Amino acid sequence: MSNKQFLPLPTSVDNFAELITTSCYYVDKTPYLKEVFADITTADDKSKVKGSNVLLFTRPRRFGKTLLMNMFESFLQISGKNPGNISKHLNYFKGTKILEDQEFCDKYMGQCPVIAITLKDASGDDFKDAYFKLAEVVAGVAAKFEFLMGSPKLNAKEKAKFDKISDENYLKSFAKKT
């Protein structure tokens, strides 16, 4: 019998940072990052676009779709508190294949605001209850991007629209009209 210590298997873990910090077994799927971005080019040069405008990740239930999407978010997400600081990103992705491509990491790691929504908590006994839960989810996601309100890249109309999306009561008011 071997005295080798084995890492625990992650069960019901759908958060990449949690998976990495709890020292569980992890299959490195970071090469997917480059694969997804391989077909994406700037909007200025549509002639180079090889892929689709839509990416569909299909897997059976409990096969890590949410974890994969969370890995994308963890890699791309800009820090609201300290834009440009990627030290947390480097810590999470230490030892993964993606860090071998410095040019790719410099271009994408920690550079984008990422809107990630999971609908697993948006349920209810009827449409109105489910809609209210969805409004809570959307407003919660929008709250993560409050720092963008100070960005000179948003005009007044975009900021007003963001304010509405961030307001849970505003979002819920649409269900009340039905």
Q: Which ranges hold each PLM region?
A:
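Glycine- and acidic
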Residues: 14-22, 51-57, 119-120, 168-177
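Mid-core helix/loop region of P-loop NTP-binding domains shared across ATPases and GTPases
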Residues: 145-178
